[in-house]
Curated annotation (Swiss-Prot):
GO BP annotation list: killing of cells of another organism; lipid catabolic process
Cofactor note: Binds 1 Mg(2+) ion per subunit.
Compartmental location: Secreted
Family assignment from sequence similarity: Belongs to the arthropod phospholipase D family. Class II subfamily.
Source organism of the structure: Loxosceles arizonica
Statement: the UniProt record of this protein carries the keyword Lipid metabolism: yes
Keyword flag Lyase: yes
Enzyme class: lyase
Entry protein name: Dermonecrotic toxin LarSicTox-alphaIB1b
Task of the protein: Dermonecrotic toxins cleave the phosphodiester linkage between the phosphate and headgroup of certain phospholipids (sphingolipid and lysolipid substrates), forming an alcohol (often choline) and a cyclic phosphate. This toxin acts on sphingomyelin (SM). It may also act on ceramide phosphoethanolamine (CPE), lysophosphatidylcholine (LPC) and lysophosphatidylethanolamine (LPE), but not on lysophosphatidylserine (LPS), and lysophosphatidylglycerol (LPG). It acts by transphosphatidylation, releasing exclusively cyclic phosphate products as second products.
Disulfides per UniProt: 45-51, 47-190
Active site: 5, 41
Length: 273
């Protein structure tokens, strides 16, 4: 999965997919009443990027729905996964459950079209704080009470705080999650970060009793760091330059071993080669 980083304006969906992304990451900010409000990152952000592009969250979802609904004039067949980077730092821990419920209702109405031929992309809820695990249970409760528990088949999870892998496993246990787990690791492109924790995550993914299904690394903009991440065995790379990742995947060393994921590749299944 080539994951376009910080895609917060509707126009950027086309831009990143046209550069080679089959997945995008979108920032979601919340208001003081736990409602998802804007797709917005803010300053500071990655080096070389404009930090302030934004849409109202529900409007972005409508644009995203068009981009992922077969038959729509804006449809991109290869856009198959969306990571919502949930900026829950503005919320108290006890607001997490309500934020999850409101997020689910927004998605149900504006992205999934109330279960009637909505967008088809798989969705990852990426949460920065382990203490906010109730966002997951709230999200699930809302979809169930709205009569659409089947949509949880399209939803996966990530805790993005670079926490100890054992602590992450514990948070999932509390949230009742047993699958659909992506594990992120990384840092802003302005700084360097080694691959030690990525290797630990990959080892967990490949062990018989691990909780992780997929591992992705962020934010990778250079060819050499792309090669290093692929050599470590990641499933996804988040980038500001999808074309760079696509170029490296075309190199003879990687062409035989990796390919770009399509809609038929289940993002919740651990890849066994």
């Amino acid at each position: 999965w080539i994951m376009g980083h910080m895609v917060n304006a509707i126009a950027q969906i086309d831009e990143f997919v046209n550069l080679g992304a089959n997945s995008i990451e979108t920032d979601v900010s919340f208001d003081s009443s736990d409602n998802p409000e804007y797709t917005y990152h803010g300053i500071p952000c990655d080096c070389g990027r404009t930090c302030t592009k934004w849409e109202h969250f529900n409007e972005f979802l409508k644009g995203l729905r068009k981009a992922t609904t077969p038959g729509d004039s804006k449809y991109h067949e290869k856009l198959v996964l969306v990571v919502f980077d949930l900026k829950t730092g503005s919320l108290y821990d006890n607001q997490a459950s309500d934020a999850g419920k409101k997020l689910a209702k927004s998605l149900l109405q504006n992205y999934w079209n109330n279960g009637n031929n909505g967008g088809r992309a798989y969705i990852v809820l990426s949460i920065p704080n382990l203490a906010h695990y109730k966002l997951i249970t709230g999200f699930k409760e809302a979809l169930t009470s709205e009569g659409h528990p089947e949509l949880m088949d399209k939803v996966g999870y990530d805790f993005s705080g670079n926490d100890d892998i054992g602590d992450v496993a514990n948070a999932y246990k509390k949230a009742g999650v047993t699958g659909h787990v992506w594990q992120s690791d990384g840092i802003t492109n302005c700084l360097l970060r080694g691959l030690d924790r990525v290797r630990k995550a990959v080892a967990n993914r490949d062990s018989s009793n691990g909780y992780i299904n997929k591992v992705y690394y962020w934010t990778v903009d250079k060819r050499q760091s792309t090669r290093d991440a692929l050599d470590a065995g990641v499933d996804g790379i988040m980038t500001n330059y999808p074309d760079v990742i696509a170029d490296v995947l075309n190199e003879s060393a990687y062409k035989a071993k990796f390919r770009i994921a399509s809609y038929d590749d289940n993002p919740w299944e651990t890849f066994k080669n």
